[in-house]
Amino acid sequence: WVRTPLLPTNLGARRTNLTLRDAQSINTRWSPLLGYFPNSPWGTLSITNNYSKSLERREATGTTSRSLSLTMPDLILSMNQLERIFGTYRWMSSASLNSKYSLRKRLNYEVDESRDINLGGDLHFVIKQVYDMTLSYDESKGTTKNFVTRLTTRQDKRQSGSAGMGFNWRIWRVNTKFDFSQSRGYDALGRISQDSKVMSPSIGLRGDFNLPAGLRLPFSGKRLTFTNRVILSSSLKLDRQSSQLNVEQTNTDNWNWNLNGDFQIGQNLRASLGSSFQLFKNRVLKDQDYYIYGLNTQVIFQF
């Protein structure tokens, strides 16, 4: 048993540190409407809950401490076939919704207590069997209270969301996305300790196609066939950051572009070529602007 007392042979030995940790976790999944509506979209409703608890006791050089971590509830609700519920099945398909809520507590006995609440969800659907759409949103709030000073030493809030669309255009797969996040935090005196806002639009392209060709060998009736498979991918992204703190360093625009190509000429010969370009601009201090570019290539022979 792991908690069997240590029995040192040295009579002068003393225990210097000790850590005891007890952890419990329970995971459950429930489909409350499946038995009542087996062939209905309501029957796809599922509820998942995770429960976890951890109690830790420490002793170091005669100083003892205890801490408790508790996550309850940690709920996830999901449902599919939403187009049948809203009657939008003529132009919408594969609609699914996931929503979540969690509460996490951490207690350091006689020291402080922290609470973090998180809620959010994501929605996915396809329009006209062409446009693959994804929407998501998350929000979290956190507080920390000190039992000694009886002050709230931490208050913060974070919000984030994204919207993405993907579709096929001829031989290309096009993916567009827009990410947004902002956070704000305050210390025990009510001063702003954290402030950040980031917007990130991006677009990506990927193509996979073949350009078959052949070469007739001289003095022979045989023909050497080349696969000529080409995979091209490229992306462009902007990270625009804004903040009221450390204004000279936190108000920036960061552009990133890359282009990669993979060429499979035959079964035994493949080549790849890549390029990248980064442009960094500081909207306050112009002398900190810079750019970076790179090129790489690789040829692979297989025998």
Locations of regions flagged by a protein language model:
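Exposed, low-structure sequence patches enriched in small/polar residues
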Residues: 1-303
